[in-house]
C-alpha cells in the first residue's frame, strides 16, 4: 500500500484529544463524471456482516476527489452485484457513465475476498475487475485501493485514497498551556493515531 504523507496544519483549532479529522471538499471540478457505486453484497452470515461498507467508502473517496459525482443508492433503479445481473439500460436512463459493482465473501477466520467490477455503461462492457484478499483490519484500506484503481482507470492519473496524511492539532490546557499533537490518519481522516504529543509547537512530521 502506498504510504505518502502530507502535512495539514490545524492553525488556531481547538480539538479534543480523541476528535476525528473531518475532510470536506465543498466544490468539485466542473463537469464531474457521473458514476454509480452499488453497495457491495455480503455473501456470508447475515448476522455477522463485514466491519465496513466497502461500496460506501469507494463512493465517498471518488466524490471527495471532486472528479466524480456518485449516484445516491436511493436513486438506483437496481442493485446488481454480479455481471449477469447488470442491465445497462437502467444506468443509461440515469445518465451514468460508469458502474462499479462487487461483493464480499468470507475467507477463513477474519479474512475476506473482495471482488469488484468496473463497467462502461454506454459501451455496455466491463473495463476492469479484481479479486482482492484482505482481512477485517485491512478491509477499509482495501476499499481505498479499489477507489484508487477506479480513479486511475478512468482518469489516467494515480489515485491517492490509500495514502496516509499527517496533521497537527492544538488543544488549549489552562490559561497559558497548550497541548500539541502530531497525528496520522487515512486520507479521508479515518482512524487517527497520535504519533507525538508536546507542549511545544510542532511544525512538520
Residue ranges and their predicted role:
Residues 4-13:
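Sec-dependent N-terminal signal peptides
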Residues 15-19:
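Sec/Tat signal peptide C-region and signal peptidase I cleavage site
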Residues 21, 82-149:
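Amphipathic beta-strand/beta-sheet edge segments enriched in Tyr/Trp
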Residues 24-89, 100, 104-106:
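Short beta-strand->alpha-helix linker/helix-N-cap micro-motif
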Residues 101, 165-170:
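Residue position within the beta-strands of beta-propeller blades
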Residues 109-113, 174-183:
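Structural motif
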Residues 138-139, 153-156, 199-205:
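Conserved beta-propeller blade repeats
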Residues 186-203:
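Multi-bladed beta-propeller domains
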Amino acid at each position: 500500500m502506498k504510504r505518502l504523507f502530507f502535512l495539514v496544519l490545524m492553525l488556531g483549532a481547538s480539538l479534543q484529544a480523541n476528535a476525528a479529522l473531518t475532510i470536506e471538499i465543498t466544490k468539485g471540478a466542473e463537469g464531474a463524471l457521473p458514476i454509480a457505486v452499488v453497495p457491495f453484497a455480503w455473501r456470508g452470515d447475515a448476522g455477522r456482516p463485514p466491519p465496513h461498507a466497502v461500496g460506501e467508502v469507494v463512493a465517498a473517496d471518488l466524490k471527495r476527489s471532486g472528479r466524480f459525482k456518485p449516484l445516491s443508492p436511493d436513486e438506483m433503479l437496481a442493485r446488481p452485484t454480479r455481471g449477469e445481473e447488470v442491465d445497462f439500460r437502467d444506468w443509461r436512463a440515469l445518465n451514468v457513465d460508469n458502474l462499479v459493482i462487487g461483493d464480499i465473501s468470507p475467507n477463513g477466520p477474519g479474512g475476506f475476498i473482495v471482488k469488484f467490477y468496473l463497467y462502461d455503461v454506454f459501451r455496455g462492457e466491463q473495463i476492469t475487475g479484481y479479486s482482492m484478499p484482505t482481512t477485517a483490519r485491512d478491509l477499509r484500506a482495501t476499499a481505498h485501493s479499489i477507489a484508487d484503481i477506479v480513479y486511475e482507470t478512468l482518469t489516467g492519473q494515480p489515485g491517492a485514497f490509500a495514502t496516509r496524511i499527517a496533521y497537527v492539532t492544538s488543544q488549549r490546557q489552562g490559561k497559558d498551556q497548550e497541548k500539541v499533537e502530531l497525528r496520522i490518519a487515512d486520507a479521508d481522516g479515518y482512524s487517527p493515531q497520535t504519533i507525538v504529543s508536546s507542549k511545544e509547537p510542532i511544525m512538520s512530521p
